[in-house]
Amino acid sequence: MKDLSHYGPALCVKFYNDYVLAGYGPFIHVYDYHSATLINKCRLFHYNKVHGLSLSSEGKILAYGARSVTIVELEDVLKKESLVDFERINSDWITGATFSFDNLQIYLLTCYNKVLICDLNCEVLFRKSLGGERSILYSGIIKVFGPDKVYVNAGTVMGGVIIWDLFSETKIHNLLGHEGSIFYVNLSNNGRYVASCSDDRSIRLWDLETGKQLSVGWSHTARIWNLMFFDNDSKLISVSEDCTCRVWNIIESRENVAELSISNVYEVHLIKSIWGVDVKDDEMIAVTSGNDGRLKLIDLLQLKRHGDEETSFSLDDIAKQCGDIFEKNESIKGFQWFSFGVIAITSLGKILKYSDVTKQWKLLLTNEKFNSYPITNGIQTQNIAVFSNNKSDILLIKFSKDSADIIETEEFHLDELSKTNNCLVTEYDDDSFLLTLQSPNPREKFVCLEISLQNLKIKSKHCFNKPENFSSSCLTSFRNHILVGSRFSTLVIYNLLDESEEPFIIRRLSPGDTTTSIEFVEDKDNSAVFSVTNRDGYYVFIELTKNSLEEGPYRLSYKVLHSNKMMKGFLEGAFFNSKGEYITYGFKSSLFYLYNETNCYELASEVCGGSHRLWNLAKITDGHVLMYIKASRFHLRKIYNSIVPETLENGVHGREIRDISICPVSNTNTNDNFKDGHIFCTASEDTTIKLGYFNNRTGKVQNFWTQRKHVSGLQRCQFINHKLMISSSAREELFLWELNDKYNKRPYMTIRQALPVSTNNSDLRIMDFDVKFISQSGDFLLVTVYSDSTIKIWHYRENQNKFDLIMQGRYKTCCLFNVVFIALKEELLVVISPTDGHLVVYNITEYVPFSVDPISGDLVDHKLDATISNLPAPVAQLPVHQSGVKSLDYVANATRTSATILTGGDDNGLGLSNLKLDDSNKVTLKTSDFIAAAASSTITSGMLINGGKEVITTSVDQVIRAWEITAGKLSLVDKKRTTVADTGSLEIISNDEDADSEKTLLIGGVGLSIWKK
């Protein structure tokens, strides 16, 4: 068994020249941070994780973690796979380590506040300690100021920060003020300040000379794990359990007085804990590493790097530049960004231009027709501004690329509408754009104008009937159709070639209200995919298909491919960037956000004011520009693309992975994009399901979506065929998901149905489930087991998309961990594994309206009516384990007369049992082998592979074991330690027809590892 890739907690991170070095389990990863290229992955320790790194100016790396320490050359780390031979084991836990001033020795700080001075072979030369102190340390660093000046900064578990001189072994200060353990301490390079963070969520700044507390910084909402000084000791950067990275200014008001002031907050990791942080001072770039395995680069000069990121003007400022005077209550009522700058309109019809080159405002013209509720739109790529009012007047202005000239203007009135309350525009084809007008009168038509891009003349006019409760909010075009978003999560599709054709209406697309954006995504054959967002946080991907009819041209149909909900407040729109990542934007309270939904991190944020805000977001060459009015000032905020890659690793879940499932390969799948690997799902304690893809050869994982439908930690997820997946969790949540992977750019996944719950406020957990498909049908039988010992059997009907309960009962009063259907001969058996250590078998053949095909084992539907029946008594019970049976797998023999059952338990045991039907179909269940100490802790997963001849097990002791089965007996053939903590889930891709073929193992827990066997 060999490692292919690993994603898990990254505990430390350091910049070194053009590299970023990160501690990933027992490995160190080296990246070129300018290109986000992983240069090498080198193993430093046998078992322990790398907790900290120190780098010498000569290219040596000092790494430590738990009791392990090693010194290696950077050149070797860049080229070699393993350097574990250099690992040395210390007698005590190491909390900090660094090189001496001349780089000829190292200092190791242990958890007992002792320092070991070692040579470069890690041999101890001297031991230093502080007399009279018996503190246990949670953290600590050693700060080297010179050959004879070395300070030890010890963060104790009892809330004190002890600073002592290494060579004189004398105490300098015991800084008291924190409540709870000290998680990190740091000293400024100039020797003036000490900064500490702790369990109490505060950062405290101390004067090193006097020991006086200078300032307390409150901002983090959870424990703070790490901090450091940067920018000539004028700033602090801190990272926390709250997944934010925060920057603090140290404001010196007078001598020996300094204040901590929060400067920036970056939401950069998932769910729980950022562990490491470092700053490259000369470029002002930070890197963070977290529990989710992400390595995130942060541009600390996001608001200053280009010099024109933030601009604002009052109406007086604009008036001075224009040489014009605005009326007392006049205000800006609309604005649009173009290649040259901004075009804006005031409440009295004054049209203004702001040049992004000269930074000057100019009054272009005044049109008093547009002093009545003006609406501003534009075709940004063509520099065409569109103004409308509530009296159905339209003004079009086309500018030259440099805005020096107005090329064309056109003004017209629409007689078809008595009043207008909304105007929308969208690009159409190479020669024209579309403009739609809506009247508040429900009896009046919805008007769509096709307008020439060259002379701004109306080329054609379309008047459509409006559906009931129609209120247009967004618009896009596709071929000869327009798609109009409306309130009540409604989408209306009009055919521009036939005004008399009834519109195609999609109602209640999501539970939210106003549709905020519609974007074309991709198409294939006769189908096209659109992204639809909703202000209440929902986004949906729909597939529109043209179905040819014998009579008439075609008929439209739609299907929801993907649905999800943002957790960021109001959602105003979304788009895909050049990397294929889904970017969303909107408002959370008064904060505007730009968010990478694919990889789950914030790109930018801006405080924008209240709910009735006037704003606009536009694309520019190297980013976006946000325009908004706040406190009567017009603000321009340019959000540039980062000068460095956003991430070096995207990571996985923020908390442990409970289950993994690989999608079986479909014989009908014609998409070649996923042929080098597999689509798979991970279900996590963080309540989310991630849909991703891994490459078979490299093990590289790409995430596509993070589903948030569950409200509690996941228990199980399982693909039941190549297009359906089931997930379960607490609160009796069980969802049936449908996968669509026919499109070229990404797969999609949406909920098809939810299992009915027993009560409105259930707290039961669905521990496991299994399905049995009905032959030549999409229908299946589903068995679910619950934490209160309940067993339920359901019939899913595909054509009705409905779960019907057909059987229920209880085992005893203990929790049920696992369940499987086993079809032997013509009998359908249900096997459960409860917490009492037994295997329990039920024969339900006579109680379900199906029979079993003895050859294939599939169910045969006899179209019989089913009533809810009680679960029959067990036909066999076998005590296999002393306590809970945590894993269950089986393989039936070729004749389907018996099955081999594998169990792993809380008692560290591994059991092999034989389930058999005799000639009279009586069930016998016997243990064929049991290994009492198959692991040193709970066996969490076990899988039979190679037709039941081999076994792979995972256990909490972080050891993966491979076993062989010979004549019904288990024998250990291989074992290897994994760096995934809380090892719980296992999934294997293998070819049972070829025993010698390579097998791919996915191992989940706190992290994800991909192995080959």
Swiss-Prot record:
The gene is RTT10. It holds the Pfam family WD40. Belongs to the WD repeat WDR6 family. Interacts with TRM7; the interaction is direct, and required for 2'-O-methylation of position 34 in substrate tRNAs. Interacts with RRT2. This is tRNA (34-2'-O)-methyltransferase regulator RTT10. It is found in: Cytoplasm; Endosome. Gene3D superfamilies: YVTN repeat-like/Quinoprotein amine dehydrogenase. Keywords: Cytoplasm, Endosome, Repeat, tRNA processing, WD repeat. Its main location: cytoplasm.
